[in-house]
């Protein structure tokens, strides 16, 4: 869609599940979005960066959300590889 100024505007931008790449629909009320802060390993303080993970309701229904979050955090370097 375009607004009065001629700029492209989307009314709804769907999210994708970080674990399965499925589109999270507007009526998926079981989905969650987690924002995890990046911590400086030397000082233990929060930096300006965050990592955001969206988990769809289907993954949560199967009980796989905790495994998916650990796998994604390992891939992003938030958790050590031998965790």
UniProtKB/Swiss-Prot annotation:
- Report TM segments: none
- Name the Gene Ontology molecular function terms of this record: ribosome binding; structural constituent of ribosome
Q: Which InterPro entries match?
A: Ribosomal_eS21, Ribosomal_eS21_CS, Ribosomal_eS21_sf
- Superkingdom: Eukaryota
Pfam families reported for this sequence: Ribosomal_S21e
Question: What's the protein called, per UniProt?
Answer: Small ribosomal subunit protein eS21
State the similarity comment. Belongs to the eukaryotic ribosomal protein eS21 family.
Biological process (GO) annotations held by this record are: regulation of cell population proliferation; regulation of translation; rRNA processing; translation
Q: Organism, per UniProt?
A: Drosophila grimshawi (Hawaiian fruit fly)
Q: An example Gene Ontology cellular component term from the record?
A: ribosome
Where it sits in the cell: the answer is: Cytoplasm, Cytosol; Cytoplasm; Rough endoplasmic reticulum
């Amino acid at each position: 869609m375009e607004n009065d100024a001629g700029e492209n505007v989307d009314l709804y931008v769907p999210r994708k599940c970080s674990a399965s790449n499925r589109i999270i629909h507007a009526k998926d009320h079981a989905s969650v979005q987690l924002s995890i802060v990046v911590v400086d390993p030397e000082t233990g303080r929060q930096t300006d960066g965050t990592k955001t993970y969206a988990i769809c309701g289907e993954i949560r229904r199967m009980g796989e959300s905790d495994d998916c979050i650990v796998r994604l955090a390992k891939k992003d370097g938030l958790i050590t590889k031998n965790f």
